[in-house]
Regions:
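Active-site-adjacent structural elements in enzyme catalytic cores
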Residues: 23-197
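Short, basic, low-complexity termini and linkers enriched in Ser/Thr/Gly/Pro
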Residues: 1-22
Length: 197
């Protein structure tokens, strides 16, 4: 699903970015064609402080956190109802060089495929290396994404490391993934810190 709608910023004045225990999520609207620097910095600050963010990608909305924050990783695993060490989360990276920080050296053919396909709506399952966070050390492979979405890429660039991510599932039997950010906010506002549209 391509998201080319015009976006603006709406901030919830009751939200406190640093005290993440007493919160109702903030709903941020950001222009994909020109992501607002102030809004992106707020998202990065929340991620660095252990927050969870729902954000648009080039496919469906993702639920993500900073790869270096164990408590945030545990929160996502709890929300998804899985043990962290058994969770199959993707690493959202900013570009191919970022990917190489977390995977073993790949052959030329695989590199050419990645270069041609990314950024794009694909998750590549690749062999992980020794730089994986301790929570993922037992995994031999990791899912790697570089979404074709300026908001997601700018968040990862400014954060300086990948976002651990999973898709937002809908309980509706007909519609498996939610694509309406206002409905997502309504459902997730007490579980996450920011919902971005």
């Amino acid at each position: 699903i391509r998201r080319n709608r015009v976006k603006a910023i709406y901030l919830n004045p009751k939200s406190n970015f640093l005290n993440l225990k007493s919160f109702m999520a903030q709903f941020l609207k950001i222009y994909e064609n020109n992501p607002n620097e102030v809004a992106i910095k707020k998202v990065v600050e929340v991620l660095k402080n252990g927050g969870l963010v729902i954000y648009p990608t080039d496919t469906v909305y993702g639920l993500g956190c900073d790869i270096t924050n164990t408590k945030a990783l545990e929160r996502i695993a709890k929300i998804k109802g899985v043990k962290l060490e058994k969770a199959n989360f993707s690493f959202v990276c900013s570009d191919l060089s970022h990917i190489s920080d977390y995977i073993k050296q790949i052959d030329t053919t695989t590199f050419k495929i990645l270069k041609r396909a990314l950024p794009g709506p694909y998750t590549f399952i690749l062999p992980g290396n020794n730089n994986l966070p301790k929570e993922f050390k037992k995994k031999t492979t990791v899912g790697i994404r570089v979404p074709d979405n300026a908001i997601a890429l700018e968040i990862v660039r400014q954060l300086g490391n990948p976002i651990v991510s999973t898709s937002i599932h809908d309980e509706d039997e007909v519609l498996e993934y939610s694509t309406d950010p206002e409905l997502i906010f309504e459902k997730w506002q007490n579980l996450v810190d920011i919902v971005i549209d």
